[in-house]
Amino acid sequence: XFEGRGGFGGRGGGDRGGRGXGGFGGG
């Protein structure tokens, strides 16, 4: 369940899809 968006212009990845980093992101 990787459905999350990045916060800082990056793709999110993770169960909750928290804040994203510079490139990837994820929670």
Curated annotation (Swiss-Prot):
Keyword set for this entry? Methylation, Methyltransferase, Nucleus, Ribonucleoprotein, RNA-binding, rRNA processing, S-adenosyl-L-methionine, Transferase
Compositionally biased, Gly residues: which spans?
1-12
S-adenosyl-L-methionine among keywords:
yes
- Return the broad EC class: transferase
- Annotated coiled-coil positions are none
Compartment(s) where it occurs, according to its Swiss-Prot or TrEMBL record? Nucleus, Nucleolus
- EC number(s) in its UniProt entry? 2.1.1.-
Q: Which GO terms describe its molecular function?
A: methyltransferase activity; RNA binding
Biological process (GO) annotations held by this record are: methylation; rRNA processing
Q: What is its main location?
A: nucleus
| Positions where Asymmetric dimethylarginine occurs in the chain | R5, R11, R16, R19
Entry GO terms, CC: nucleolus; ribonucleoprotein complex
Catalytic activity annotation: L-glutaminyl-[histone H2A] + S-adenosyl-L-methionine = N(5)-methyl-L-glutaminyl-[histone H2A] + S-adenosyl-L-homocysteine + H(+)
Segments carrying the region annotation (Disordered) are: 1-27
**Entry similarity comment:** Belongs to the methyltransferase superfamily. Fibrillarin family.
As for what it does, the entry says: S-adenosyl-L-methionine-dependent methyltransferase that has the ability to methylate both RNAs and proteins. Involved in pre-rRNA processing. Utilizes the methyl donor S-adenosyl-L-methionine to catalyze the site-specific 2'-hydroxyl methylation of ribose moieties in pre-ribosomal RNA. Site specificity is provided by a guide RNA that base pairs with the substrate. Methylation occurs at a characteristic distance from the sequence involved in base pairing with the guide RNA.
Q: Subunit info?
A: Component of box C/D small nucleolar ribonucleoprotein (snoRNP) particles. It is associated with the U3, U8 and U13 small nuclear RNAs.
Q: What is this protein called?
A: rRNA/tRNA 2'-O-methyltransferase fibrillarin
